[in-house]
């Protein structure tokens, strides 16, 4: 298998699922794991290969069973922008707007504050098990799957990943392996060469997603430039561009979206939920809107071939109402309170 990758040959989904099973069963050496992760990244993974790797991870995961549809708002990370936690804030706003959210995430790897870090600073308990996460979704409208809790066998790849210290195929798998397997997603990808490939995974699953990368490198919908976007629905993919100026958002310098550590970013989140206007609120509104669009598409609502700006404008209005009506701040308070009463089941 390593020889095939070294020769630039693609693997089947069955091949990569087998390889991931070997890794997560602790049957592979650190050298083999490192070589595999780097080789497939250098070759360039296919949707089939990524889908197989995700399948292998799901076979070892603690899965979450939820009632009905939900959306995830997640990114690969690795954009090194130092931005505030836009996807985390957007997740809370989307849930407050009435759309069920199951977010999958982890602590920061290459930044000062990951999604898990800022949620913890906001008072949300991280180490909840499948039943507790499902209860949060059922009672509050949002749950968080902390990756180490739900993918414990991934620890067997940890040493190899730390030793080589460069992005590998494992960096791409987080957005593809939400343990609740929601049918919709807003997915940011920091790697431009993989944007279409990641979209292809969702297309093969029959899921609905907006897969995005800002022209400034942000693994979110940016407001400093346009955003390269793949709209995925019903097994089909369409490429488009999101321009914030068409949504009434003035372009800003990327510095306006930069944050700090978890406590700083938690303070920014509280400020946004309190109704503070500005660049961060605008970014949260447009990303929240995109998640709402993806969720609607998963339920057969909306036209995936229509100009995405029209649907985004409607979604932004819903998101703004959830903030300005106090629902986002109230939901965060309820979520934090409930999560701290639950165990790790």
Swiss-Prot record:
GO MF term set: anthranilate phosphoribosyltransferase activity; magnesium ion binding
SUPFAM superfamilies assigned: Nucleoside phosphorylase/phosphoribosyltransferase catalytic domain, Nucleoside phosphorylase/phosphoribosyltransferase N-terminal domain
Role, per record: Catalyzes the transfer of the phosphoribosyl group of 5-phosphorylribose-1-pyrophosphate (PRPP) to anthranilate to yield N-(5'-phosphoribosyl)-anthranilate (PRA).
Residues binding Mg(2+) 2: 219-220
Binding site for anthranilate 1: 75, 106
The protein's assembly and partners: Homodimer.
Transmembrane helix listed as a keyword: no
Residues at which anthranilate 2 binds: 161
Family: Belongs to the anthranilate phosphoribosyltransferase family.
Binding positions (5-phospho-alpha-D-ribose 1-diphosphate): 75, 78-79, 83, 85-88, 103-111, 115
Chemical reaction(s) catalysed: N-(5-phospho-beta-D-ribosyl)anthranilate + diphosphate = 5-phospho-alpha-D-ribose 1-diphosphate + anthranilate
Pfam families, per the entry: Glycos_trans_3N (PF02885), Glycos_transf_3 (PF00591)
Binding note for cofactor: Binds 2 magnesium ions per monomer.
Binding-site residues, Mg(2+) 1: 87, 220
Name of the protein in its database record: Anthranilate phosphoribosyltransferase
Origin species: Nocardia farcinica (strain IFM 10152)
